[in-house]
Every structure is written in structure tokens, then in C-alpha cells.
């Protein structure tokens, strides 16, 4: 601990996987990091952070050193809890011939189950006759005749009875308690010593957390559910970085499905995790009159962390990110609390450098813009904010007031090769039954009510790139149109629907003649930049400005400029 900086950096593992070394160290991914490749450039170690992970999610495979948690099941005084549940099954490869259910069915009698299918979210599902499917076992189903593949891109829903729900909300307590132990204790109740001590006292002076995507939504839900206060009423996390995460999770419910993302553009529209409240500050739901906010409980207990919320363009289209900074009806901008920064990463895709969908499922080339430099900048800024009170760089995000946050109907750039999305995912209020506030879902399937929270998206310029937010040089000195969304191809099924978590990139033509041949209105690379030296100088100026404002680290400015110098066309 003598070489440490006093800060614990805790990662909420995404589906049991360790990701902060690839994200913050540009390292090779591994759940058992042991080599120089797994350490990458050593950024976190050079900064002196103590790294911590633990399991919080159940039901994960034991392979690949995933971090898991074993949980008790909930029961009634009279015996097992049995309820009707549902799974949604969507395949993006052509060879899927069996489907694994989240829970074991209490009976393989087909009369007690139902399989439905639809092509698009907006369609009514069709019941698949019992003679066209069967149980393989209590947790697996397949189509008939045996060997029939599930249709790629079709949305299947399977309704069945299950028993013995695990108490998945314990995951929140597992996170709270391990971090509280590391920060405050010298030993646990059994006498096991805390390894993070110095001179017989806890060595940590502050605690930071980060989660990406699913685990970022878990982090927002952790805060919302009041777990940033430990059992001794102390602060758990001093600072948090929820990343590409605008909703919450399907965790603290009976028969939860923690790995679900709701929504995902095509399918997965009816699971908990995207309901009010959306914003960090308290707001009033116009449909129910309920007042609530992500930070309501920690505000009441004076245990809120400082937050840098990092989102991509994908969250606006897929997950209602606009509602984090507007009122629930999308009519006016709101002001995040003083302890929150919103860094909206301009024209960035959720997946960054690692596409989610197999090749061919999305209709356009992937947007692989690397947003990791902004994550590294966020960590250093957050740590400084927590440690000595230096305010983190200001929020940057699209706003209604200046016309940078708009209805999607205003977006239609005339770009060859652009397959325009119908619009962002709608945000209906869902009816899960009268006991949803107790974590009990009594309607399978839930019902989408007529009430709609209005979702807006970032405006774009003549090139099709977003006009507001925190823009990397890839966007301010562009080589093409980068989008946080894409649409599904004919091959991928659900044609025209949003393509999961991937974005699209449509490069500029190299020359004026080339763009005129395709009637591309966007100036070509040759028309924009005299040569690579001109391009590189502009990239350097853009990166230096971000560094000056505190969003980029000097070593990442250097990396970005060196990469630009290698670009040729």
C-alpha cells in the first residue's frame, strides 16, 4: 500500500467479466490478469489505484473465471414461490436450434406454456402451435421438427411457470459490504483481517466506482436503491462513473433477469429497468404524480457520491438518455445536481471498438470510434474532485434550448448509403401489475400503456455528425459520418429496426469526383484537408483544447495525434 494513492477503484463487473484493464489501460482482456499484455500501458497502476472486483450477479457460467454470486431462494411460509414468468429469445446467428430459459419450468406440459413470435416490436405476436415446438428439458425448448433453426432476428417470447426465485437484490448488499469492509474495517466479523491496511488502520482514503453498460445501469440502480449508505450509515462510494448506461436494472425483483437490457432497439421492450425516474435530481412523473430521482435516497441520508455520467449517442436512440437531462415529457431542459456531471460523448457508439452484432446483421459499417480516452480523463477528474474538491470539468450534452436536442423527425441527412432509422425507442409506461413496487411482477406479459415519456435525440450537422456534447477529434475533425445508431439489415431480420448497441460509420469520399459520382453532398477528404499534415494539425488543435479543458490526459492527446499522423487517403 506504500505505493498507492489512497484510492480504491472498484469495477462493477459486467456479467462477471473484468473490463477496467482493457478500458483504462488499453490492455488485452482477461478475467485472470497475469501478464504484461493484461496490464496494458499500466495507467491504473501508475496512478496508484487499488483495484477491487467481486461477484454480484448469479446464474453465470463457471468457465472463464467469471465473478459470480451464489444466492438463497425466496419461499412462502407454505412452500415454494411459483409464478408465471416469461423469457424473450432473439437470435442473431442462423444456427440456433435450441433456446435456454432463465429458469426451469415447473412442468414440461405444453398446456402450461406458450411460445409467441413477431417480426417487429410494433406487431402483435403470433402464437406458435404446440405441435411446432417442444421442451427438450425443463430449461430448454426447441422448434419442431427437431433441427429447425429459430429465425434470425425474430422476437420469440416464451411464457411458463417457474419456482424458487433467487434473492438477486443481495447483489447490491454484496457490493456495498465488500467496499465498506475495504474502506473502513480492520477485520470482518470472523476476524479475517482487511488486507488493505497500514499501521493497523484502513489505508484507503477514498473510493471510486465504474460500470459499463449493464454494470453501469447496476451502478445507477445501486445509488437509486439507497445502497451507497452502509449499515453504519457511512458513504460507500465517494465517486462513481456510470458509463453508457441511461437506465437501471431488472435486479431487485422476483424472478429477475439481471442480464436483460431494456430496451435494445429490436426486442426486449417489456422488462423492468427503464422506468421512471430517469434523472439524477427529483422530478415528478406526470402520469402518476410520483416524485423521485436516482439520487433521492442518498440525498436524504447525505451519502451521495460525486458522479460523472458518460453516455454515447446510442443511449439517446436506444435507452432514452434525453430524459436524464429533460423533464419526463421532453419539453424543457433540467439542471443536474451540483455533484453530477453529464459528459455526452458526441457521435459515439455504445460498443466503442468492439461491435456487438455479428457481421451482416447491421445494415451499415460499424462506428468504432474509441472513447476510452474520455473514460481515463473522467477517472482522473473524478478522483481530483473527490480528493481535494477541484470541480470536474463542466457537463457537455445536447439541450432543447439551443436546438441541439430534437425530435428524430428533424433528422434526415442526404447521405448515400445511409439507412435512416424510424426513430428512437419509445418510452411507454409499462403495467407490471399492482405489486411492482414490492418487486413482484404479476403480469406476464406486461402491458404498454398509452402514456409516453417523450424521447429526443441529438441534432446533427450537414455531415450527419452530432452537434453538441463532448466531441473527440474523430468527430470535430471528421473523416466520415459517425452515428450512435444503426439499423438491422434484411439478413439480420427485423429490417429497419435499431441494431442493438452498434453505431454506424459512413466514410467521406476521397475526392470531389468520387463524391459527385455518388451524389454525396458531404465535402470529400481532399476538399476538407490539404494533406495529412493539415489534417494532423487540426487533430492536434482539437485534442489540445480538450486537454486544456480537463477532458483529456496529455498522454492521450499524444496518442491521438500520433494516430492521426498515420492516416492516409
Predicted segment positions?
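C-terminal His-loop and adjacent cap/lid subdomain of alpha/beta-hydrolase
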Residues: 1-569
Amino acid at each position: 500500500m506504500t505505493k498507492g494513492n489512497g484510492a480504491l477503484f472498484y469495477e462493477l463487473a459486467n456479467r462477471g467479466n473484468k473490463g477496467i484493464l482493457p478500458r483504462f489501460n488499453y490492455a488485452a482482456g482477461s478475467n485472470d490478469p497475469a501478464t504484461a499484455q493484461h496490464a496494458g500501458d499500466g495507467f491504473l497502476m501508475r496512478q496508484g489505484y487499488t483495484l477491487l472486483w467481486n461477484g454480484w450477479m448469479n446464474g453465470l457460467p463457471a468457465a472463464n473465471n467469471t465473478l459470480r454470486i451464489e444466492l438463497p431462494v425466496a419461499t412462502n411460509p407454505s412452500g415454494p414461490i411459483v409464478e408465471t414468468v416469461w423469457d424473450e429469445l432473439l437470435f442473431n446467428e442462423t444456427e440456433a436450434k435450441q433456446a435456454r430459459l432463465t429458469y426451469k419450468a415447473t412442468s414440461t406440459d405444453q398446456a402450461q406454456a406458450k411460445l409467441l413470435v413477431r417480426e417487429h416490436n410494433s406487431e402483435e405476436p403470433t402464437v406458435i402451435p404446440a405441435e411446432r415446438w417442444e421442451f427438450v428439458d425443463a430449461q430448454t425448448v426447441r422448434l419442431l421438427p427437431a433441427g429447425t433453426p429459430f429465425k434470425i432476428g425474430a422476437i420469440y417470447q416464451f411464457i411458463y411457470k417457474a419456482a424458487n426465485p433467487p434473492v438477486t437484490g443481495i447483489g447490491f448488499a454484496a457490493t456495498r459490504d465488500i467496499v465498506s469492509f475495504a474502506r473502513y474495517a480492520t477485520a470482518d466479523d470472523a476476524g479475517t483481517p482487511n488486507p488493505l491496511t497500514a499501521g493497523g488502520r484502513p489505508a484507503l482514503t477514498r473510493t471510486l466506482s465504474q460500470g459499463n453498460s449493464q454494470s453501469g445501469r447496476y451502478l445507477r440502480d445501486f445509488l437509486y436503491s439507497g445502497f451507497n449508505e452502509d449499515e453504519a450509515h457511512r458513504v460507500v462510494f465517494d465517486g462513481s462513473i456510470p458509463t453508457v448506461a441511461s437506465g437501471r436494472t431488472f435486479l431487485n425483483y422476483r424472478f429477475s433477469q439481471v442480464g436483460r437490457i431494456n430496451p435494445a432497439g429490436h426486442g426486449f421492450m417489456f422488462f423492468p429497468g427503464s422506468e421512471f425516474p430517469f434523472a439524477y435530481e427529483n422530478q415528478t412523473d406526470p402520469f402518476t404524480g410520483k416524485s423521485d430521482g436516482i439520487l433521492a435516497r442518498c440525498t436524504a441520508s447525505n451519502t451521495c457520491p460525486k458522479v460523472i455520467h458518460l453516455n454515447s449517442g446510442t443511449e439517446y436512440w436506444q435507452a432514452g438518455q434525453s430524459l436524464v437531462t429533460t423533464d419526463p415529457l421532453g419539453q424543457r431542459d433540467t439542471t443536474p445536481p451540483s455533484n453530477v456531471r453529464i459528459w455526452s460523448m458526441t457521435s459515439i457508439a455504445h460498443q466503442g471498438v468492439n461491435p456487438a452484432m455479428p457481421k451482416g446483421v447491421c445494415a451499415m459499417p460499424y462506428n468504432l470510434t474509441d472513447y476510452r480516452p474520455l473514460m481515463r480523463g473522467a477517472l482522473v477528474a473524478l478522483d481530483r474532485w473527490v480528493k481535494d474538491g477541484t470541480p470536474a470539468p463542466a457537463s457537455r450534452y445536447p439541450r432543447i434550448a439551443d436546438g441541439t436536442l430534437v425530435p428524430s423527425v428533424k433528422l434526415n441527412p442526404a447521405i448515400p448509403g445511409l439507412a435512416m432509422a424510424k426513430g428512437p425507442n419509445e418510452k411507454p409506461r409499462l403495467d407490471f401489475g399492482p405489486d411492482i413496487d414490492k418487486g413482484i411482477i404479476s403480469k406476464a406479459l406486461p402491458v404498454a400503456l398509452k402514456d409516453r415519456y417523450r424521447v429526443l435525440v441529438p441534432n446533427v450537422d450537414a455531415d450527419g455528425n452530432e452537434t453538441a456534447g463532448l466531441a473527440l477529434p474523430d468527430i470535430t475533425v471528421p473523416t466520415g459520418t459517425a452515428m450512435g445508431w444503426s439499423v438491422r439489415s434484411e439478413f439480420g431480420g427485423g429490417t429497419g429496426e435499431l441494431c442493438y448497441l452498434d453505431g454506424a460509420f459512413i466514410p467521406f469520399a476521397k475526392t470531389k469526383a468520387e463524391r459527385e459520382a455518388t451524389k454525396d453532398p458531404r465535402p470529400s477528404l481532399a476538399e476538407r484537408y490539404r494533406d495529412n499534415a493539415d489534417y494532423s494539425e487540426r487533430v492536434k488543435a482539437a485534442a489540445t483544447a480538450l486537454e486544456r479543458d480537463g477532458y483529456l490526459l496529455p498522454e492521450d492527446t499524444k496518442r491521438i495525434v500520433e494516430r492521426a499522423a498515420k492516416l492516409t487517403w
